[in-house]
């Protein structure tokens, strides 16, 4: 509690001093009127005081005939008022019991005000802490942005205590990353019962997956830049460091190739795909110094059909600024990166688009993105997908909010939660720091799950990491061994004030002892104490609140936990089928056992009946 001692105002004491001055002067004059008493029987003159009390009304209250003695007596009254004014010389500010810090653990009752009255409309943090997902259902003072940073190492129950309980809530659309590829099977039934559309993008096996064709979401030159930025930023894995020369060259060439396919697709009425970028890269080099390469001829043809187009301008800019060995190096980088599209299965999942990203925040949708745990070769594709997700959904939300959407109104806009498990494996998402600052107003939130703060810093740099963390309304700590992370959370916990008692004793001829009480400051949680919380415990740091220490959420206590699957052999295991081509779907519907394999000879022997 803050206690502030302020300097007293002079004017009231000045008026008091004048009043006492006159009162003392007037009483002295009344004293002079009192008859003398016997000095033997009334040594202290109390008889005169008794007479004065009995004759207060005999003397006029107005007496301005001052004598030297009455002035002196009056000044003594004024001096009393002056001493009263000076009696407080300490004008400091005090916080009794909080001299070294006011940190303490939050209580369950204190966090109750952040909950929604409807349990299904809450986000689940720990066993006893939840927060309403929709700010319009909470009072203004209890509204916190819904971005969350989750710290948790391997085996710290990130999926079981954080991801699964919130999926079971079924209160929004979801985008969830999964490095094992089983979360959709374990939670799918609960989502189907809630009426969700299911989408799956598998970068682990490239099988049984929906398709993602980024060209479906390119509508103008700015979109070309966004796609090129997403790919080149992911290739530059430490994008906050190093020579900017190479990223600049990469971006120019990337804009040129993607732009060519975009404009050529519009002119010839087809939907391009990233695999065709690989085909163009193979034709970049000249076979003879004097003979133009196939790609050069393609750009010349595009310029004839669409003069001054953006792709041709970027191509000219690239050729004018980079030549010789530099150009060859850029070609080599692109050839290496895009060689992943030589895999037939990968080309299949980027040929057509069935994800329908623009519908995710207006139709209840659950999206599962399977990303490899250790292989970074496809990070540029997952980063590109997330770049498209944020761009498309922000545009959809803006259209709905501004009343420009053809079929939906503001009441139809759904909240969308992105649960990004193993956030560092996604790759660098372009412009994430500003994106995370603005998605709140679009009913979008991101939950970033990392093992340490350094995982974010590697991708985005220290300053951008600060921006990302500052835009998180909550930090949920499940466990970590990273010292920087532990120090940060210890500092965030704050310092508390403790009573300290020192006792000393000396022995000998002049034995003595003393006891001294004092107050000291101490971290509420030291880095060691943060690191050694119980395996079933969690720490929750809500914005502007004290840290809350609680048990991790027990998944079995969720009302809909019975819908979860424990393995392929139980009835809750969700199975799905996606077809990457019409032939695959036809084969699956017909059944391999019903397919008759015949050769050309057998076909020639089939009699043809002509009517």
Residue ranges and their predicted role:
Residues 112, 118-120, 380, 423, ...:
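A short glycine-/small-residue-rich loop at the edge of a beta-strand within enzyme catalytic domains
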Residues 371, 375, 422, 450, ...:
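Short loop or secondary-structure boundary microenvironments that flank
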Residues 436-438, 445-539:
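Conserved ATP-driven motor cores of ASCE-family P-loop NTPases powering translocation/secretion/packaging/pilus
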Residues 1-156, 160-163, 506-507, 606-611:
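Basic- and hydrophobic-enriched, low-structure N-terminal and domain-boundary segments
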Residues 28-32, 144-444, 528-549, 562-611:
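P-loop NTPase motor domains
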Residues 107-114, 128-140, 160-161, 326-332, ...:
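A broad, low-specificity signal for short, low-complexity segments enriched in glycine/proline
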